[in-house]
Amino acid sequence: MKNPFQKINLLILFAVLLFSACKKDSQEISDFEYIGFPNENELSWDYPTKPGSDKWKTFQSHNEMLEACQIPSTILTNLSTEELFLICLKYPLLMDISAFNFVTDGYASYETNFNGIREFYQRSNASSVIYSYYQQVKLEKNNATLYSTISFVFRVSVIEYMISVSPVISKYSTTQRKEVATELLSKLNIKKSQKGDFPETYLNSTYRALIRIIRCDEAGTLSTDDTKLANYFAGGFSAPESIIAQVDEIIRQYLK
């Protein structure tokens, strides 16, 4: 007959092993670092010339505006990744992205014309910074002070592109990709539940981000032979129900 103390010791050992296994699994599911962000109005650097200012009104060309928005090289490399990310979101010409027929062309222009976003994508912790920030974005009406404004909704779409762009995707582990996809799906469901406040365009930004996370390789190449899906991915049109249903199934299969 076994000593009752031996039974207790075995139970304790089993509990410890179970806890250790659970802890290990948890770490494998999420190894993103939680990051706090500074107040956007108290950054160490801000754009000296902005739309509406007297200086801005003197510009005669778009190139002058682009030049005025560059971050000085002596400052750029010394900014923390958190600050740099927020500065990228405050880029005065950010809305230029929406001036293109294809979403991908708009973001390509942003990356070509702004040294801040190029530097951000090169940072080793860019993926952790942007994911941590996206997690903290509140889409519920009672939590978002700028909820119904175009600028807030557009900003969310920009973040969703950035979180799924190839230089950031290349930094994700397999488990991190799934975690990002899960967070995107959560945000998508909130948007769907409040569709009157989120135009179809901004539902598409989440769908496209999910496609990039699930179907793109590290170079950002979409793995599909489906022309319609490829065109939707590029942002050439708003998706018909058949494409949305297809994407929903891709998401379901990936996260099941």
Residue ranges and their predicted role:
Residues 45-55, 59-256:
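Non-catalytic all-alpha helical scaffold/repeat segments
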Residues 8, 40-42:
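Residue-level detector of functional hotspots within protein domains
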Residues 2, 36, 46-49:
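Selective for proline/serine-rich intrinsically disordered segments
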Residues 19-40:
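Bacterial Sec-dependent N-terminal signal peptides
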Residues 1-20:
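Sec-dependent bacterial lipoprotein signal peptides
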